[in-house]
Design a protein with these regions (language model features):
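A short, well-ordered alpha-helix in the C-terminal region of glycosyltransferases
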Residues: 277-291, 303
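C-terminal alpha-helical cap of glycosyltransferases
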Residues: 294-309
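Acceptor-binding helix/loop patch of EC 2.4 sugar-transfer enzymes
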Residues: 20, 46-82, 106, 137-138
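Acidic donor-binding loop of glycosyltransferase active sites
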Residues: 95, 208-222, 233-235
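Short hydrophobic beta-strand element within catalytic cores of glycosyltransferases
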Residues: 226-230, 236-240
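Short acidic/histidine- and often glycine-rich active-site loop of Leloir-type glycosyltransferases
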Residues: 241-252, 256-257
Length: 309
């Protein structure tokens, strides 16, 4: 592996790649724009290079779902068609297309031969043992984690404006801690039970002290890192079908999956007071991480090396 820093006065990427004189290198591109901007350069430098397009998530699918929520927003339609074109082109040009979940691998069979599709998901593993984490009665409040990303902004608005009023009508003691720089664009939300904590370098304290992780995502794509992070610390999760996709979660076994605001609010209230259900979800947290394990990743990398080199 090598790292290249481009200083155009002295060098450029093409000259650098040619000087390496690599034999059948793997050129791995992260996200569609990087692939489209650079795959020809990789081929020019090494005619036998193997092109890997790592999708991260399916951008056009995310915008398609956003259109369903906001059909009049022109930017969603514009981005949908833009990324549909780019992702179709990249999947056709690449020798291997890496998706983040088996759901997205199946979806991408519309655009690429299934023989060149492979799922490599996020990597998560337990950071504590179940014996090391606080018990049901040692925890309080619910946790949301999100950066400045449109699906996260929508999720926070949905949570605070539509879900939590139903919750607070029955239990107004439940607080909501929101971690991540989503706070920078949501200053209009002010509520005594809601704390916007901004970027937190080490989230372990919140993952250990919170009673529930919530992920009320109404659109998006890919595998949601916030849910994997909760499982790392045996923190039970309430989410939506969009939040759960790609992780092979079973409702009321690995997580509670709610379709609408009423069901989501009821799930929070039930899980917040039901120790038996809470422990059931907690006990299944580690099994939920198996598709996201380091061992699974190593097997997939071995598969790439055997099939492409």
């Amino acid at each position: 592996m090598c790292v290249y820093y481009e200083h155009k006065i002295y060098d450029d990427r093409l000259s650098f790649l040619k000087r390496l004189r690599l034999r059948k290198p793997i050129s791995w591109f992260y996200a569609v724009k990087i692939f489209i901007d650079n795959y020809r350069l990789a081929q020019k430098a090494n005619s036998d290079t193997v092109l890997v397009y790592d999708m991260v998530d399916i951008h056009h699918l995310r915008y398609h779902r956003a259109i369903q929520l906001e059909p009049k927003r022109f930017s969603n339609k514009k981005n949908f068609y833009k990324f549909l074109y780019l992702e179709k082109k990249a999947s056709q040009k690449a020798d291997l297309v890496v998706t983040v979940s088996e759901d997205e691998e199946k979806y991408m069979q519309k655009f690429a031969n299934e023989n060149k599709l492979l799922t490599i998901s996020n990597i998560h593993y337990p950071k504590k043992t179940i014996e090391e984490v606080p018990s049901f009665y040692e925890r309080e409040n619910i946790l949301f984690v999100g950066s400045i990303h449109p699906p996260n902004i929508d999720a926070v608005e949905f949570l605070i404006n539509e879900i939590m009023p139903i919750v607070w009508a029955k239990n107004n003691s439940i607080g909501v801690n929101i971690v991540g720089n989503v706070n920078e664009v949501m200053k209009e939300i002010v509520h005594p039970n809601v704390k916007f904590l901004g970027y937190v370098p080490d989230m372990e304290e919140f993952l250990l002290k919170s009673k529930i992780m919530v992920a009320p995502l109404r659109y998006g794509a890919g595998v949601k890192g916030k849910i994997g992070q909760a499982f790392e610390y045996f923190l039970p999760v309430v989410t939506t079908p969009i939040g759960a996709e790609g992780m092979k979660l079973e409702n009321h076994k690995n997580a509670i999956i709610a379709e609408n605001k009423e069901d989501f609010a009821e799930a929070i209230l039930n899980l917040y007071s039901n120790e038996d259900l809470w422990k059931t979800l907690q006990n299944n947290s580690e099994d939920s991480l198996f598709p996201l394990s380091k061992e699974n990743l190593e097997n997939k990398i071995d598969l790439i090396e055997k099939n492409l080199l």
